[in-house]
Amino acid sequence: MSGECMLHIRLFSTNLYIRSTLLRSVSDPNTLLHYCSMSANKRKLKRQRESPDSGGGKQPRLAEGRARESGWLLREVNELRRAAQGCEVNKKRLRYLSDTQKIKQGSDGFLYWMSRDQRVQDNWALIYAQQLALAEKLPLHICFCLVPRYLDATYRQYAFMLKGLQEVAKECKSLDIQFHLLSGEPGQNLPSFVEKWKFGAVVTDFNPLRIPLQWIETVKKHLPADVPFIQVDAHNVVPCWEASGKLEYGARTIRGKITKLLPEFLTEIPLVDTHPHSASRAAEPVDWEEVLSSLEVERSVGEVDWAQPGTSGGMNMLESFIDQRLRLFATHRNNPNYDALSHLSPWIHTGQLSAQRVVKQVKREKNASESVASFIEELVVRRELADNFCFYNPSYDNISGAYDWAKKTLQDHAKDSRQYLYTKEQLENAKTHDQLWNAAQRQLVSEGKMHGFLRMYWAKKILEWTASPEEALSIAIYLNDRLSLDGCDPNGYVGCMWSICGIHDQGWAERPIFGKIRFMNYAGCKRKFDVAQFERKYTAVKENSNKDSKKSSSKN
């Protein structure tokens, strides 16, 4: 990015921040202007009222009187994007997968093969593809290859993804970018599609997982030799291959590397604007209802009502996080009874929301520095550590991928007596003796998510209640991939591997079944939060579900 471009963005950002701060000071009772006019007694009462610990465990009051109206975030972001227009993509963010790097002459356009990053704006891969197309004065196309089934993903995840893609297609139309939905494996369809449309280059996303890597290799093998094939990491703030060239042992070994590179990569993201070069041929229209009905996936796991698919839904959730929950994150993120989390993982997983955009906007909040630091540790360091693990460890989802000490201790205790043994079906249906575990599982079933603290407890109990570590890991991954909106993701695999196999952790005091793997139990959870309150909430979920089932049966 040029120095002139950076200076322009900084000046614009400073102006925008000053303007928003002045607006806030007029009507926000939490600002210094208002605060100084309050009496000492009022200030004392205000501190007591807003203290997270003052409510006897109740949800703390959120900031009141914010000057920002609904939709402020999108308006602010659009201004920032436009101010960054013309800024180049950092070349370290991309790599050529083909032997040739020369753009094929006599082409009819450029193709961005969208896969992991399913959004138009804040997408470095699409930005780079558009910059190539602009340089050659050619049309820009986007395609997405829809496989009818993927691992243990269900209708829940597919519907969320496809409704987000429908939003992508609509935005593409408004920008004069052609959107194509191809059906089937990329390796079978993409190379011939490229030849048919005479594309001069193909740009695609980065994904460290096994099947997407196989797709890349197959496409690379069958693409015309004179068509450049370029991969751009638009999912990570620091590109995976730049953060580290090897498998990192844990957060402490990668944190410094990522932090050192953030100033280079955590830049403002330019706008994807209307493309000035129209295609002579239009993409085939997509019948989205037909696409949804043609899926070969399990449909008993339905959609959830709390998560609006698409980038617009993700931006709305980000806005609510910044306004309502961010300041609670540092102190209350490990308490499942508090609404202190971002809830952004479904949109970040599907790429409907850019992690870099999230970081940029959260960092602008100057009154929640502790929470901002904690959140960036989770969103950047821990999440990108998960990509590192999956990219450099082919056995990221099985016991073979564990550290030697962990494999040995699990093997040493594999035959230990278990007080309880449950089948996969019993676990999926929350039929255990542990009401906290059952409540967490019901949350996953009903909401497509589970509180982060309970994910650890949940997976560790599966290790304790199944016949072997291999079976425990298999069931944990199956349930997460099947039920969670952010399933089939590096974060999910690493979360299960951390809980069951000690990945990115150390050995602890040896005990039955777990060996030296970190132990968690019910009593420990009771010391952390009001377990009974959480259990009551999801017992009610079970009762409501049973009532709905009875009503449905009576109607039939």
Curated annotation (Swiss-Prot):
| InterPro entries membership | Crypto/Photolyase_FAD-like_sf, Crypto/Photolyase_N_sf, DNA_photolyase_2, DNA_photolyase_2_CS, DNA_photolyase_N, Photolyase_Class-2, Rossmann-like_a/b/a_fold
- GO process annotations (BP): photoreactive repair
Q: Where is the Photolyase/cryptochrome alpha/beta domain?
A: 108-240
Query: What induces the gene encoding this protein?
Result: By visible light.
User: What Gene3D superfamilies does UniProt report for this protein, alphabetically?
Assistant: 1.25.40.80, DNA Cyclobutane Dipyrimidine Photolyase, subunit A, domain 3 (1.10.579.10), HUPs (3.40.50.620)
Task: Provide the function of this protein.
Answer: Involved in repair of UV radiation-induced DNA damage. Catalyzes the light-dependent monomerization (300-600 nm) of cyclobutyl pyrimidine dimers (in cis-syn configuration), which are formed between adjacent bases on the same DNA strand upon exposure to ultraviolet radiation.
Q: What is this protein called?
A: Deoxyribodipyrimidine photo-lyase
List the source organism: Carassius auratus
User: Source organism lineage?
Assistant: Eukaryota, Metazoa, Chordata, Craniata, Vertebrata
Q: Which gene encodes it?
A: phr
